[in-house]
Each structure stands twice: as C-alpha cells, then as structure tokens.
Amino acid sequence: NVDACITKLRIQVVDPSKVNKQALLQLGAKGVMNPSKQSVYAVFGTNADRIKNEIKDIFNGKSPLLTNVVLSSGPALAAAQPKKKHRKHLQVIAPVKGEVVSTKSVKDETFSKDLMGHGFAIIPESNEFVAPVSGEIVLVNNHAFGIRTENGVEILVHVGLDTVKLTNKGVFKSHVKLGQKVGVGTLVLTADLDKIKANKLDTITPVIVLNESLGKKKIIIKKFGQVNQKAKILTIK
C-alpha cells in the first residue's frame, strides 16, 4: 500500500529487506524511517502527495514504469521560486495560543531531526490557527498549510502528528484556498483539539521554515514557553 501525508511518503511493504533506502535518498528524500516492521516512511516534504499519485498511476497502468532512471548522488533540485524581494528581517508569529517548545521534543523524526527545515513547535490551547506570516497560500490540506512570503521564504504549519488519519472526519476546517494572499494573523484553519486527543494523537504543531527557501538566511527563536496567539516567536534575517 502507498499513501502520503503532507511531509512523508508512507509505504507498507511485504519484505522490508528489499527496500532500497539509498535510492529513496538519491531521489530526493530527506530521510527514511521504519516506524513499524512493514512500514517505510520517506520524507519528501510537500512533494510526497504528488509522488504517491505518480506511483499509484504506475501501479494502475496509467503511466509507464521507467527502467532507465539515472539517480543523482546530489540533492534534489528545489522547485522554481519567484523573484525574491529582500528585506532585513522577517517575523514569524505564533499561529495559536499555547506552549512553544523545541522541535527536538516532537515525536516525529521529520521535525525532531530538522529534515525539512528549522523552526519551533507549539502545544496548542486553542482551535484557531492563523497565518504566522503574510504571503501566498502555496499548500493547503486538512491538517497543514504552507505560506510563501514575498521574499520567497516558505513556512509550513503542521497541526498535530499523524493527523492525516483524521482527514474528512470533521476535525479540521480550512478557511483559505490555494493561491490566496493572506495577511499575518489571518484565520487559516480550525482544528478540534478534543477530537484529536480522543483519537490518541498528539496535538503538538511544528512551525517550520523550509530549508530550500531559506538560503543563507539565519533563524533566531526569540521565545519559548507559554505564549499568546500572534506573539513574535521567530526572526529570519
């Protein structure tokens, strides 16, 4: 079986010994994990869902199986970015009220090992999640959203862990559309935290600056601990 969430390609296999992890890394995966004996997760970031669909098309005979693919030993090329408008500093606010903690405490290696990028995590205490920066909605899903700022920096907000399992179960509601321009503090998503907890899933919410969009900029986290929604948490400069 092949599935995907907003960050990972999720594959169920019969024989784990036949999985070529190096090939997955050469194809652009930032990391490969084995959460269970017959599960393989490959961190392809926001490309995971597209790759899942391409694999399923091959399985269903809609696309030919390529047998002469040459794997690169270098990193995958980042998607084309719009022309950047340079600013000295970019402030990232808390998308929700709660407790700001290090990504190292997130029980998902995608975030705890900074495979997609750097940032912070927040244990939410409210159901409403707002845009942490101004920009364009470049990714929107039940449990996550991405915003690209005018200088090309991309921020991913991922509400909860493994919450892709709650898709179409009345837990999440998006208030924006792909391509929409939003201001900082605009309501983007609501989540029923009680339902997430009732399903024995973690509500911790990583807020990540994607590596490919960061370039040579530096990240400074200004505040940990209890914060209000819209508090200034992170500076990019």
Residue ranges and their predicted role:
Residues 124, 209-211, 237:
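Short, structured patches in soluble enzyme cores that scaffold and shape functional sites
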Residues 170-171, 205-229:
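Short peripheral tails and domain-boundary helices/loops at the edges of structured domains
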Residues 28, 200-203, 213-214:
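Glycine-centered secondary-structure boundary/capping sites
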Residues 101-108, 144-146, 154, 183-199, ...:
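Short hydrophobic beta/alpha edge segments that flank linear recognition/processing sites
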